């Protein structure tokens, strides 16, 4: 390490496994931005389900060990690398990805993954925009090609992506239905765009949903837990209906015939298949949402950096929790 190198606290993962592999270190070198990169002094960092999949080693994209997790940071520009013209020191920003990892006091990010954070949104809310809102927008409008007037069911609507999907769907003039597993979750879903909400812990909710939409069925289902719901989803769809899979924790058995009569489709989505141009499109739409006011991130549990293992544990096992899980670093 070079003499005078600044040090920071950061979470490091040296092996894949459970939450216990998340180790806080206080002697990690502060990264230096290169061309088209910025260094962000992190104020808050979102914790996403995908973070837990990557940490466990079960995700298709495996980082080189050791690594620092974290994609969604919000904070202040500390320094900029060469050929960066859109940002300057002190700018309030949020990200959709990082180069060095967001569970740290400072994070590097490529300049095309960084966006201005409006003054009316605090850093916790800024850390809840990136992956949740960009994923929800991609799922609804890019993958499902949903149109005004269509019905949308968000399965698992009380989490970060689910609430983002409800807000976007309502702003785009869809009929919005949501499911959640707790009374608090159902209340939050109704407050954030859903016309109706159902308890997904009740077997009878399938019949209730069918009654709500009538014989036509549901046009689009945004699915957060496909291994549990996919078979029922296919029976809820309209003619030509689409299930967009955002999350799944395991395999599931379905009857392909359920897709044939209705000519329905099942499509997976991952934010990181988006091109730079698509990210720009998503960002423009979401920036309008911030300006108009329909984009309102909901914050759930908040943890200091040293409690990150607990944050991962709670995110994995506390189904029905409402809002985005956030780490605080200020």
From Swiss-Prot:
<dbReference type="InterPro" id="IPR002364">
    <property type="entry name" value="Quin_OxRdtase/zeta-crystal_CS"/>
</dbReference>
<feature type="modified residue" description="Phosphoserine">
    <location>
        <position position="248"/>
    </location>
</feature>
<dbReference type="InterPro" id="IPR036291">
    <property type="entry name" value="NAD(P)-bd_dom_sf"/>
</dbReference>
<dbReference type="GO" id="GO:0003730">
    <property type="term" value="F:mRNA 3'-UTR binding"/>
</dbReference>
<protein>
    <recommendedName>
        <fullName>Quinone oxidoreductase</fullName>
        <ecNumber>1.6.5.5</ecNumber>
    </recommendedName>
</protein>
<dbReference type="Pfam" id="PF00107">
    <property type="entry name" value="ADH_zinc_N"/>
</dbReference>
<feature type="binding site">
    <location>
        <position position="229"/>
    </location>
    <ligand>
        <name>NADP(+)</name>
    </ligand>
</feature>
<dbReference type="Pfam" id="PF08240">
    <property type="entry name" value="ADH_N"/>
</dbReference>
<dbReference type="InterPro" id="IPR013154">
    <property type="entry name" value="ADH-like_N"/>
</dbReference>
<feature type="binding site">
    <location>
        <begin position="246"/>
        <end position="249"/>
    </location>
    <ligand>
        <name>NADP(+)</name>
    </ligand>
</feature>
<keyword id="KW-0521">NADP</keyword>
<keyword id="KW-0694">RNA-binding</keyword>
<comment type="similarity">
    <text>Belongs to the zinc-containing alcohol dehydrogenase family. Quinone oxidoreductase subfamily.</text>
</comment>
<comment type="subunit">
    <text>Homotetramer.</text>
</comment>
<keyword id="KW-0963">Cytoplasm</keyword>
<dbReference type="GO" id="GO:0008270">
    <property type="term" value="F:zinc ion binding"/>
</dbReference>
<keyword id="KW-0560">Oxidoreductase</keyword>
<dbReference type="InterPro" id="IPR013149">
    <property type="entry name" value="ADH-like_C"/>
</dbReference>
<feature type="modified residue" description="N-acetylalanine">
    <location>
        <position position="2"/>
    </location>
</feature>
<dbReference type="GO" id="GO:0003960">
    <property type="term" value="F:NADPH:quinone reductase activity"/>
</dbReference>
<comment type="function">
    <text>Does not have alcohol dehydrogenase activity. Binds NADP and acts through a one-electron transfer process. Orthoquinones, such as 1,2-naphthoquinone or 9,10-phenanthrenequinone, are the best substrates (in vitro). May act in the detoxification of xenobiotics. Interacts with (AU)-rich elements (ARE) in the 3'-UTR of target mRNA species and enhances their stability. NADPH binding interferes with mRNA binding.</text>
</comment>
<feature type="binding site">
    <location>
        <position position="200"/>
    </location>
    <ligand>
        <name>NADP(+)</name>
    </ligand>
</feature>
<dbReference type="InterPro" id="IPR011032">
    <property type="entry name" value="GroES-like_sf"/>
</dbReference>
<feature type="binding site">
    <location>
        <position position="181"/>
    </location>
    <ligand>
        <name>NADP(+)</name>
    </ligand>
</feature>
<dbReference type="GO" id="GO:0005829">
    <property type="term" value="C:cytosol"/>
</dbReference>
<dbReference type="InterPro" id="IPR051603">
    <property type="entry name" value="Zinc-ADH_QOR/CCCR"/>
</dbReference>
<feature type="binding site">
    <location>
        <begin position="269"/>
        <end position="271"/>
    </location>
    <ligand>
        <name>NADP(+)</name>
    </ligand>
</feature>
<keyword id="KW-0007">Acetylation</keyword>
<feature type="modified residue" description="N6-acetyllysine">
    <location>
        <position position="23"/>
    </location>
</feature>
<keyword id="KW-0597">Phosphoprotein</keyword>
<feature type="binding site">
    <location>
        <position position="53"/>
    </location>
    <ligand>
        <name>NADP(+)</name>
    </ligand>
</feature>
<dbReference type="GO" id="GO:0042178">
    <property type="term" value="P:xenobiotic catabolic process"/>
</dbReference>
<feature type="binding site">
    <location>
        <begin position="158"/>
        <end position="161"/>
    </location>
    <ligand>
        <name>NADP(+)</name>
    </ligand>
</feature>
<dbReference type="InterPro" id="IPR020843">
    <property type="entry name" value="PKS_ER"/>
</dbReference>
<dbReference type="GO" id="GO:0070402">
    <property type="term" value="F:NADPH binding"/>
</dbReference>
């Amino acid at each position: 390490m070079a003499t005078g190198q600044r040090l920071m606290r950061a979470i490091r993962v040296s092996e894949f496994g459970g939450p216990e592999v998340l180790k806080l270190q206080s002697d990690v070198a502060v990264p230096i931005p290169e061309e088209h990169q910025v260094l962000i002094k992190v104020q808050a960092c979102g914790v996403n389900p995908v973070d837990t999949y990557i940490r466990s080693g079960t995700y298709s994209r495996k980082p080189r060990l050791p690594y620092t997790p974290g994609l969604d940071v919000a904070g202040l520009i500390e320094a900029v690398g060469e050929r960066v013209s859109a940002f300057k020191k002190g700018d309030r920003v949020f990200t959709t990805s990082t180069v060095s990892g967001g569970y740290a006091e400072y994070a590097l990010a490529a300049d095309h993954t960084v966006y201005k954070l409006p003054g009316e949104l605090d850093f916790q809310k800024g850390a809840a925009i990136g992956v949740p809102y960009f994923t929800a927008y991609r799922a609804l409008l890019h993958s499902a090609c949903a149109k005004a007037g269509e019905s949308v069911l968000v399965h698992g609507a009380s989490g970060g992506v689910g609430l983002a999907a409800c807000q976007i769907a309502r702003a785009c003039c869809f009929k919005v239905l949501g499911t959640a597993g707790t009374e608090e979750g159902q209340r939050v879903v109704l407050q954030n765009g859903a016309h109706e909400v159902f308890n997904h812990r009740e077997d009878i909710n399938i019949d209730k949903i069918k009654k709500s939409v009538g014989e036509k069925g549901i046009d689009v289902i945004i699915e957060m837990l496909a291994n549990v719901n996919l078979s029922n989803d296919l029976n809820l769809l309209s003619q030509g209906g689409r299930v967009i899979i955002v999350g799944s924790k395991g395999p599931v058995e379905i009857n392909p015939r359920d897709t044939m009569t209705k000519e329905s489709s099942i499509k997976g989505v991952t934010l990181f298949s988006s091109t730079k141009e698509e990210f720009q499109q998503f960002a423009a739409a979401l920036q309008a949402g911030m300006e108009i006011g329909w984009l309102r991130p909901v914050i759930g549990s908040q943890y200091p950096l040293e409690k990150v293992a607990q944050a991962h544990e709670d995110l994995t096992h506390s189904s029905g929790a409402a809002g985005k899980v956030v780490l605080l670093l200020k």
